[in-house]
Curated annotation (Swiss-Prot):
CDD domains: Ribosomal_L30. NCBIfam families: rpmD_bact. Pfam families: Ribosomal_L30. It comes from Brucella canis (strain ATCC 23365 / NCTC 10854 / RM-666). One of its GO terms (cellular component) is cytosolic large ribosomal subunit. InterPro entries: Ribo_uL30_ferredoxin-like_sf, Ribosomal_uL30_bac-type, Ribosomal_uL30_ferredoxin-like. One of its GO terms (biological process) is translation. Part of the 50S ribosomal subunit. Keywords: Ribonucleoprotein, Ribosomal protein. This is Large ribosomal subunit protein uL30.
Amino acid sequence: MAEKKGKTVTVEQIGSPIRRPAEQRATLIGLGLNKMHRRSTLEDTPAVRGMIAKLPHLVRVVDEA
């Protein structure tokens, strides 16, 4: 499978989804996160940036490459 060359962003979950709205939980799953301190590396797209912006209290950007 061909690997895409492009910018990536690594995010880490820093907050618990317990007692959060279902929409925020779904956004975490969309980012590939579901447990505390897990990291996920994703393509740096406007959609991913929008999901990160919706959850500033639950995720942090670790690395932008």
